[in-house]
C-alpha cells in the first residue's frame, strides 16, 4: 500500500509546477517569435528581395544621364542646317562644400555665372542638400572659369557635367522651316517638332557607386551605357535656291515697307518637292525668344507689366509661325488661274470665248467693277486673264456654275491640308460650299475673294495647273539618314489625284505665258527663258485697314517645259503701289532666273512681244479686286 505525500513534499511541487508552466510559456513564445522571424526572413529574402535590392542599389549607385545628340539636318546640296554643340551644366552639392568657404564660393560663382549672390549663399548653406542646379547649358568659357575658380580656392562640391544643345550654324537661314528646340532638346516648331521622334536619340547613363551620404567612393565602381544619336534628315530644300529667295524677299520687304511679313515658296512643279520656303523677316533659332523684327521689338519695349508680357508672347509666336504653311489669305487674282482651268476643263468656256467688260456688272443687287473702274470692252478668255478682268471672270464663274466650281475647288486641294511634312497646317480653309453659295458669293470667289486658303495650297494648286493636271503632295524631307549619313529611308513624290486633262494644262500654260508677254505679268520676264505667271492684289477683308492689300505673283519657268514655280506674297506693302504685278513679279523673276542658271537650264529664244509694247510698270493692268453694294 503506497504512502500519501507528506505535506512538505506537496508544498514543494507547487512552485515546480508553476516554474515548468512558465518555462513552457516562454518556450512557446520564443518558438512563435522564431517562426515569425523565419517567415519575415523568408519574405525579405524571397518574396520582397527584389524590392529591397532595388532600394539598396538606389542608395549605393548614382545614375548620371548622358544626353544623346539629335540627328543632324542637311539641305539637298549638303549644307549642314542643324547640328549639336557641347555645353556644360553646373550643379552644386552643399554637403561636400567646405563650410568655411561658402561665402567665398557664393561671391565668386555669382560673379562668373551672373547670378544673385544672396540666393547662391542660401543654396550653399542648406547642408542637407546633395544636388542643386546652378546654371543650365553654359558655354565652354563659363565652365572653364568656374573650374579655374574652384581649383584656385580649394572649393569642392561643384559639379560640371558635359551636355549637348541644338545649334543652327546658318543662323536665321530657313528658320521658319527648321523650327527650334526647348531647353530639354525637344522640338518646339518646324521640322524639329514634326520629326521629333526620329531626331531624338537614346540617352546614355553612367552608374557610379556612392556612400550613405551620397559622396562618390574613392575606390569607385562605374559602368556606362553610351548614348545613341538620333536619325538625321536630308531636305528637298536647296541651300542656294533658299539663299536666292531669302535675299530677294528681304530686299523687297525693306524697299516696299511690308508691314505683315512676306512669304516666298519655290517648288518643283512635277514632284511637289519644296526647293525653298521663307517667311521674312525671320528669326535666329539659336535665340528664338529674341525678337528679330525691329518694329516688333520696339513696340514691346514700350510696354510694361502684364501688358508687356502678353505682347512679347504674341510677338514671339508670330515670328515663329511659318506663314507659308500656317496662315490663310485671300489669294486675289492669282486664283483666276483655278477658275479659268476649271471652266476650260469642263468645256464651260474655250480660250477664245468672248466676254464683255463695261463700267460694272450687277449680280443679285451687288455691283462689281474692275480695278480703278477700267473698262476692258470685249475680250477673249485669254485676254481676260492677261487683263485680270474681274467682270469677265464673274461671267466665267457663272458659266461654270457653283456645283462645278466647288468640285474643282476641292479637287485642287483647297479645302483640306496639303499633307506637307511640316506642323501647324490649318485643318481647313475658309470657303463656301455649294449649298451656302449664292450668286454674289460665286461671283466674288471666281476672281479670288471671299475664300481664304494657305499660301502653300495656292502654290500646290498652280503646280497642278501647269504640270499636266496632277495634284502633288508638297514635301520638304527627301531622306532619313543614319548616324554615318547613310540613307535609311527615301521619301518618294506622291500624286494625290489627276485634277485636269493634259490638254487643259497645256492651254493654261499658253495663257499664263501670254500674261507675262502681253499682260499684267510683264515684270516677270526673264531674258532667254519662257515664263508664265499671274498677279494678284487682294483685299484683306478681315483687316481694320480698308486699304490693306496683299501683293502677290506666281511664276513658272520654263513655261513650255515646266520645272520651277515661285510664289511671292507681300502682306501689307506701303509703297508707290500695292499691285502684285509691280511689286512681287520682279522678285519672282530674280529668284527664277538665278535658279534656272544654277540648275543649268539653257537660255533660248523667246516669243517676241509687240513693237508697241513699251509700257512701264505704272502702265500694267491692275488686278485689284473690288465690289460695291448696290
Predicted regions and their residues:
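Beta-lactam-recognizing serine transpeptidase/beta-lactamase-like catalytic domain environment
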Residues: 2-10, 82, 211-224, 237, ...
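Periplasmic/cell-envelope proteins involved in peptidoglycan metabolism and beta-lactam response
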Residues: 1-303, 319, 328, 403-413, ...
Amino acid at each position: 500500500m503506497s504512502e500519501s505525500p507528506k505535506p512538505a513534499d506537496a508544498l514543494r511541487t507547487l512552485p515546480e509546477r508553476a516554474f515548468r508552466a512558465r518555462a513552457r510559456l516562454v518556450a512557446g513564445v520564443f518558438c512563435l517569435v522564431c517562426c515569425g522571424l523565419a517567415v519575415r526572413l523568408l519574405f525579405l529574402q524571397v518574396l520582397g528581395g527584389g524590392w529591397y535590392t532595388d532600394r539598396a542599389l538606389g542608395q549605393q549607385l548614382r545614375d548620371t544621364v548622358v544626353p544623346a545628340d539629335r540627328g543632324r539636318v542637311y539641305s539637298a546640296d549638303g549644307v549642314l542646317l542643324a547640328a549639336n554643340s557641347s555645353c556644360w551644366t553646373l550643379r552644386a552639392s552643399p554637403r561636400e562644400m567646405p563650410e568655411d568657404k561658402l561665402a567665398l564660393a557664393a561671391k565668386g560663382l555669382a560673379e562668373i555665372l551672373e547670378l544673385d549672390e544672396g540666393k547662391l549663399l542660401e543654396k550653399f548653406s542648406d547642408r542637407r542638400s546633395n544636388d542643386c542646379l546652378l546654371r543650365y547649358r553654359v558655354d565652354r568659357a563659363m565652365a572653364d572659369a568656374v573650374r579655374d575658380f574652384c581649383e584656385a580656392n580649394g572649393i569642392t562640391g561643384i559639379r560640371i557635367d558635359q551636355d549637348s544643345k541644338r545649334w543652327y550654324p546658318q543662323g536665321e537661314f530657313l528658320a521658319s522651316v527648321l523650327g527650334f528646340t526647348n531647353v530639354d532638346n525637344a522640338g518646339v516648331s518646324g521640322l524639329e517638332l514634326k520629326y521629333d521622334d526620329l531626331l531624338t536619340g537614346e540617352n546614355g547613363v553612367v552608374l557610379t557607386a556612392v556612400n550613405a551620404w551620397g559622396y562618390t567612393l574613392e575606390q569607385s565602381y562605374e559602368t556606362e551605357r553610351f548614348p545613341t544619336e538620333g536619325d538625321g534628315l536630308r531636305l528637298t530644300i536647296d541651300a542656294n535656291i533658299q539663299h536666292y529667295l531669302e535675299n530677294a524677299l528681304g530686299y523687297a520687304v525693306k524697299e516696299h515697307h511690308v508691314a505683315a511679313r512676306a512669304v516666298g515658296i519655290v517648288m518643283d512643279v512635277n514632284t511637289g518637292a519644296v526647293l525653298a520656303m521663307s517667311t521674312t523677316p525671320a528669326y535666329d533659332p539659336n535665340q528664338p525668344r529674341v525678337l528679330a523684327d525691329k518694329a516688333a521689338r520696339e513696340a514691346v519695349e514700350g510696354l510694361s507689366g502684364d501688358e508687356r508680357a502678353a505682347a512679347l508672347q504674341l510677338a514671339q509666336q508670330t515670328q515663329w509661325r511659318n506663314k507659308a504653311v500656317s496662315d490663310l489669305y485671300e489669294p486675289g487674282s492669282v486664283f483666276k488661274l483655278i477658275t479659268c482651268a476649271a471652266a476650260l476643263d469642263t468645256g464651260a468656256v474655250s480660250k477664245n470665248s468672248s466676254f464683255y467688260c463695261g463700267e460694272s456688272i450687277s449680280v443679285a443687287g451687288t455691283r462689281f467693277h474692275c480695278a480703278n473702274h477700267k473698262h476692258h470692252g470685249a475680250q477673249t478668255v485669254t485676254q481676260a486673264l492677261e487683263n485680270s478682268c474681274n467682270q469677265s471672270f464673274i461671267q466665267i464663274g457663272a458659266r461654270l456654275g457653283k456645283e462645278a466650281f466647288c468640285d474643282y475647288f476641292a479637287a485642287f486641294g483647297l479645302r483640306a491640308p496639303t499633307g506637307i511634312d511640316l506642323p501647324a497646317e490649318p485643318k481647313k480653309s475658309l470657303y463656301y460650299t455649294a449649298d451656302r453659295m449664292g450668286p454674289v458669293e460665286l461671283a466674288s470667289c471666281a476672281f479670288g475673294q471671299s475664300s481664304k486658303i494657305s499660301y502653300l495650297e495656292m502654290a500646290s494648286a498652280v503646280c497642278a495647273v501647269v504640270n499636266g493636271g496632277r495634284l502633288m503632295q508638297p514635301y520638304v524631307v527627301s531622306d532619313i539618314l543614319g548616324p554615318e549619313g547613310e540613307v535609311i529611308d527615301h521619301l518618294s513624290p506622291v500624286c494625290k489625284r489627276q485634277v485636269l486633262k493634259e490638254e487643259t494644262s497645256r492651254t493654261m500654260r499658253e495663257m499664263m505665258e501670254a500674261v507675262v508677254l502681253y499682260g499684267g505679268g510683264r515684270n516677270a520676264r526673264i531674258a532667254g527663258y519662257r515664263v508664265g505667271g499671274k498677279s494678284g492684289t487682294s483685299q484683306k477683308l478681315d483687316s481694320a485697314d480698308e486699304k490693306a492689300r496683299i501683293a502677290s505673283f506666281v511664276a513658272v519657268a520654263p513655261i513650255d517645259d515646266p520645272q520651277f514655280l515661285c510664289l511671292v506674297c507681300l502682306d501689307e506693302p506701303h509703297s508707290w503701289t500695292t499691285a502684285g504685278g509691280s511689286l512681287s513679279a520682279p522678285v519672282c523673276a530674280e529668284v527664277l532666273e538665278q535658279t534656272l542658271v544654277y540648275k543649268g537650264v539653257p537660255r533660248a529664244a523667246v516669243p517676241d512681244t509687240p513693237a508697241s509694247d513699251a509700257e512701264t510698270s505704272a502702265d500694267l493692268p491692275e488686278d485689284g479686286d473690288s465690289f460695291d453694294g448696290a
